[in-house]
Amino acid sequence: MNLNATLFAQMVVFLVLAWFTMKFVWPPLINALDERSKKIADGLAAAEKGKAELDAAHKRVDQELAQARNDGQQRIADAEKRAQAVAEEIKSNAQAEAARIIAQAKAEAEQQIVKAREALRGEVATLAVKGAEQILKREVDQTAHAQLLNQLKAEL
């Protein structure tokens, strides 16, 4: 085992190389690795944040869709209620108008009946006077009297 100066020189060169590597080469490599791991960690954090924001956006969209559906259903229900109310109002107005028309027709019919009765009374009175006049002008004869009464009945 020969330990000579070459081995000692190789050890010194190796130590100088190790020191040089530790002093000048190793820190930039460590910095590059640290920066890369930081970028990867930041990218993963951004991905997680983006995923969380996407989930939150999906939830907001679902809530807004549900709210829109509820609003739409509420508006439809309100429109149906308004339509029913309008239909009921139209129906009640039509019934009131029909009742008014019927009452007016009854009143007109009653007036016509009253007028017809008045006219009939006038005609009956005129016919009675004419009949009495004719009876008084003729002799009192039973057959003639009966014929006059039959003629008056026919005219009435």
UniProtKB/Swiss-Prot annotation:
It is a single-pass membrane protein. Keywords: ATP synthesis, Cell inner membrane, Cell membrane, CF(0), Hydrogen ion transport, Ion transport, Membrane, Transmembrane, Transmembrane helix, Transport. The chain crosses the membrane at residues 7-29. GO terms for molecular function: proton-transporting ATP synthase activity, rotational mechanism; proton-transporting ATPase activity, rotational mechanism. CDD domains: ATP-synt_Fo_b (cd06503). SUPFAM superfamilies: F1F0 ATP synthase subunit B, membrane domain (SSF81573). It comes from the Bacteria. The keyword Cell inner membrane applies. The keyword Secreted does not apply. GO terms for cellular component: plasma membrane; proton-transporting ATP synthase complex. Its main location: membrane. It is found in: Cell inner membrane. NCBIfam families: ATP_synt_b, PRK05759.1-2. F-type ATPases have 2 components, F(1) - the catalytic core - and F(0) - the membrane proton channel. F(1) has five subunits: alpha(3), beta(3), gamma(1), delta(1), epsilon(1). F(0) has three main subunits: a(1), b(2) and c(10-14). The alpha and beta chains form an alternating ring which encloses part of the gamma chain. F(1) is attached to F(0) by a central stalk formed by the gamma and epsilon chains, while a peripheral stalk is formed by the delta and b chains. Belongs to the ATPase B chain family. F(1)F(0) ATP synthase produces ATP from ADP in the presence of a proton or sodium gradient. F-type ATPases consist of two structural domains, F(1) containing the extramembraneous catalytic core and F(0) containing the membrane proton channel, linked together by a central stalk and a peripheral stalk. During catalysis, ATP synthesis in the catalytic domain of F(1) is coupled via a rotary mechanism of the central stalk subunits to proton translocation. Component of the F(0) channel, it forms part of the peripheral stalk, linking F(1) to F(0). PANTHER family: ATP SYNTHASE SUBUNIT B, ATP SYNTHASE SUBUNIT B', CHLOROPLASTIC. This is ATP synthase subunit b. It comes from Burkholderia lata (strain ATCC 17760 / DSM 23089 / LMG 22485 / NCIMB 9086 / R18194 / 383). The gene is atpF.
